[in-house]
Amino acid sequence: MFLQNLFLGFLAVVCANAQFAEFTAFDGKFDFKEHLTSRSPYHKPYFYGPSIDFPTTCKIKQVHTLQRHGSRNPTGGNAAFDAVGIANFQQRLLNGSVPIDYSVSGNPLSFVPTWTPVIEAANADALSSSGRVELFDMGRQFYERYHELFNASTYNIYTAAQQRVVDSALWYGYGMFGEDVHNFTNYILVSENATAGSNSLSSYNACPASDADDFTTPALEAWRNVYMPPIRQRLNPYFSNYNLTNDDILNLYGICSYEIALQDYSEFCKLFNSVDFLNFEYEGDLSFSYGMGNSVKWGSIFGGAYANSLANSLRSVENNTQQVFFAFTHDANIIPVETALGFFTDNTPENPLPTSYQVHSHSMKASEFVPFAGNLITELFQCEDSKYYVRHLVNEEVFPLSDCGFGPSNTSDGMCELYAYLNSPVRVNGTSNGIQNFDTLCNASAVAAVYPY
């Protein structure tokens, strides 16, 4: 009892004289914009790795960037979430064929009569103004970081041929070289059809053998039938004798996502809570995982050709004068490459991402890896021990390689010795055989020469 009273007395004195700092550890706010799957604005991922500074005992020798286009309008198409589908739904909201009950107190859709849509079907697929700024700024930052490698007179910039990707690559070039961009660059447009073969930067379009497989549609339908009914039930009372469909919910998510991309604000996002956004984010993860990622056999095949080309460039560092490599592409090409490089080993075709419930801890989160303007940068260093080491940056964060040992610090610094990296079981099939596998298993078109990525 004496000790208890002594402790309480001591505590009272401490509390009376203490200058308390506000405890903020539990004050984190949910930022829904970072959970809009691949339609999220650019942001860093959550796997906070080591510092991205160059190691003090190493010298940068090569850098390879695989860069997604900037923020854009919806893709063309009539389906829900596509440009025409969203535009038609917007018109139905405005003309009353999707009848909002404005008599309901606190109706979150009460703004619709004075709302002016910014999503237009005529702008389908086009890069947004913010997308141009994003890529310009990224090009500027890339040049500032790696300027010592820019020792050539011109640089080949490979880009998937779709206009928004080409525009992104051009704005990136302006960020690096300013008005002299055309004096320093050679833009090489890579076809987005099957003729590109293993050089494709939209490899899902260059693999005829995969065309008959559709694992994505049943996966998405299954998940939508889990998470959308509660949303429909919650929102239905705000409409007059109208029951929302899954397509309606998808279009509401689409308006929210693309208004954020086009103007960084959307009243429609207020219809959803944090759980809704996490469930929508998971839908995006299922789409990538079952479409071209780690839940299907095609994921590592689609990404293997780039992985093999990258590995060839890394291996030839001592005989190669080229030090900077550029490839501009889509989100749907970056995820397969990262799959082939062994980033997402927790799910496989034998253990796919579940469609009846959400796995919060899965590794492949599209919001983190491929937001608008997302990128995968591969750095090659030579260190004081004369060995070469590989490191990946995902959207300005070091990806925590854990399958191939350590860097020269002998700690978890995100670096691996070059041949330990290339020969690791999680990626050796891609780094050694990716092009051959793509050619054979995809029944791909032959190419005259392999592009150096």
UniProtKB/Swiss-Prot annotation:
InterPro entries: Acid_Pase_AS, His_Pase_clade-2, His_PPase_superfam, Histidine_acid_Pase_euk
Its EC number(s): 3.1.3.2
Signal peptide region: 1-18
One Pfam family cited in the UniProt record for this chain: His_Phos_2
Disulphides: none
Active site: H69 (nucleophile), D331 (proton donor)
Entries under Gene3D superfamilies matching the protein: Phosphoglycerate mutase-like (3.40.50.1240)
Main enzyme class: hydrolase
First-listed, main subcellular location of the protein, grouped into a coarse class: secreted
Alphabetic keyword roster: Cell wall, Glycoprotein, Hydrolase, Secreted, Signal
Xref: PROSITE patterns: HIS_ACID_PHOSPHAT_1, HIS_ACID_PHOSPHAT_2
Keyword set includes Transmembrane helix: no
SUPFAM superfamilies recorded: Phosphoglycerate mutase-like
Induction remark: Repressed by phosphate and weakly by thiamine.
Single GO MF descriptor: acid phosphatase activity
GO process annotations (BP): cellular response to phosphate starvation; organophosphate catabolic process
Location of this chain's protein in the cell: Secreted, Cell wall
Glycosylation-annotated residues: N95, N151, N183, N193, N243, N319, N410, N429, N443
Gene Ontology CC entries for this record: cell wall-bounded periplasmic space; cytoplasm; extracellular region; fungal-type cell wall
PANTHER family (UniProt xref): ACID PHOSPHATASE PHO11-RELATED, MULTIPLE INOSITOL POLYPHOSPHATE PHOSPHATASE-RELATED
Family membership: Belongs to the histidine acid phosphatase family.
Name the UniProt record assigns to this protein: Acid phosphatase
